Amino acid sequence: MSLLTEVETYVLSIIPSGPLKAEIAQRLEDVFAGKNTDLEVLMEWLKTRPILSPLTKGVLGFVFTLTVPSERGLQRRRFVQNALNGNGDPNNMDKAVKLYRKLKREITFYGAKEVALSYSTGALASCMGLIYNRMGTVTTEVAFGLVCATCEQIADSQHRSHRQMVTTTNPLIRHENRMVLASTTAKAMEQMAGSSEQAAEAMEVASQARQMVQAMRTVGTHPSSSAGLKDDLLENLQAYQKRMGVQLQRFK
C-alpha cells in the first residue's frame, strides 16, 4: 500500500458514510494525483461542508495544506486553526510540544505514527496545529504519520460508540437503527439502479421499503416488527447485485 493510499484510508475512516464521504474521497484522490491545485478554492469548499465535525475539517484542511502546493504567504484558515488548538487546553499544548520534539527526530511515516499513537487526540490535534501555524516544521512523511495516528484515535472512539449502539439492549434504539439501515440500503439500491434493465425492479423494491419504514414510523409499531425488514432488503439488494455482476462487499 502506498503512503498516500494509507493516508486516504485513515482520513476517510473518520468521515460519516453518505454522499459527502464519496465527494471527499474524490477530492482526496484528485489532490493526491496533483489534479486539484487551487488550495484557496479547496479550503473554501471544505469550510462550507455540512455534517463534518470541526476536528474532521481541521484534519482534512491540514492534509490539503500539506499536499497542495501554495504560495508562500498564503493565509492560514481560522476554521482549521480553531479545530487544531486542542480545545484551548494548556495541558494539550504542553504534550503537543513534547510530541513535536520527538517527531523532529523521526524520519519515517511509521516511526512518526507509532510515537504519536501514545498521545491523546487533543495533544495530537494541538501538534498538528503547531505545524499548521508554521510554529514548527517536520517532513511531509512525518506529518502524515501524525495525521494517521490522529485518525486512528478518532476512529477508535467512533467504533466504541457504534459498538455500544449495535449491542444496546434497548429495543426502541435497535428498532430505529434497523429502520434507518433499511432506508439507507434502499437509497443505495436506487443509486445503483441507474439505467440498467433491472433498474425498475430495484426501484420498486427500494420504494416499497421506504413506504414500509414511513408507515411504521407514522403508525408506530412494536419494536420487534422491524427485525426482518433490513435483512429482507439486503437479500433483495444482494440478489440484484449478483444479477448485475456487482461486488457485494461494499454493502455488507
Curated annotation (Swiss-Prot):
Please indicate if the UniProt record lists Membrane as a keyword. yes
Give the UniProt subcellular location, in the record's own words: Virion membrane; Host nucleus
Concerning InterPro entries, the annotation shows: Flu_matrix_M1, Flu_matrix_M1_C, Flu_matrix_M1_N, Flu_matrix_M1_N_sub1, Flu_matrix_M1_N_sub2, INFV_M1
Q: Where is this motif: Nuclear localization signal?
A: 101-105
Q: How does it assemble?
A: Homodimer and homomultimer. Interacts with NEP. Binds ribonucleocapsid by both interacting with genomic RNA and NP protein. May interact with HA and NA. Cannot bind NP without genomic RNA.
Biological role: Plays critical roles in virus replication, from virus entry and uncoating to assembly and budding of the virus particle. M1 binding to ribonucleocapsids (RNPs) in nucleus seems to inhibit viral transcription. Interaction of viral NEP with M1-RNP is thought to promote nuclear export of the complex, which is targeted to the virion assembly site at the apical plasma membrane in polarized epithelial cells. Interactions with NA and HA may bring M1, a non-raft-associated protein, into lipid rafts. Forms a continuous shell on the inner side of the lipid bilayer in virion, where it binds the RNP. Determines the virion's shape: spherical or filamentous. Clinical isolates of influenza are characterized by the presence of significant proportion of filamentous virions, whereas after multiple passage on eggs or cell culture, virions have only spherical morphology. Filamentous virions are thought to be important to infect neighboring cells, and spherical virions more suited to spread through aerosol between hosts organisms.
Family membership, please give it: Belongs to the influenza viruses Matrix protein M1 family.
Q: What is this protein called?
A: Matrix protein 1
